[in-house]
């Protein structure tokens, strides 16, 4: 059983398409964001190599208004203890506030976080805004941004610097063609 809690736009919601695309075991809980479209990204690619040329975002990335934030937080708080695993995919588009993070940290049995730094949030969405998690998965540039370190060896950066910023016993950092590097408290780095 899987439940998804998300915000969709008040207009251009694509809610029908989203609901039709879900597997039968997935329940969608929607909070509608006022005066906003559903976040959508269109990529323009060069054929035949499918190389991304540019992308256009349709979204509102300011924080949710107070009423919508309260609805979202209540929905999460009401459901979080029912599940063995909470997976947060935070794209930095204004949905997840400090109050939401507090609920996630206190209520989750196991909290897995992916907080993305991307061209739309300009690096303002660092994984360090989650001081406590059971597992985080980010890419190497996101790990570097999180600890403001462009040059250190990635293994040192993860095992010494990132672990000082986030209380998290399990970390995976994807590293492009090199695969990924994992850290587990007590076992250290595995690459």
Segments (PLM) and residue ranges:
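Ribokinase/PfkB-type carbohydrate-kinase core domain
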Residues: 1-191
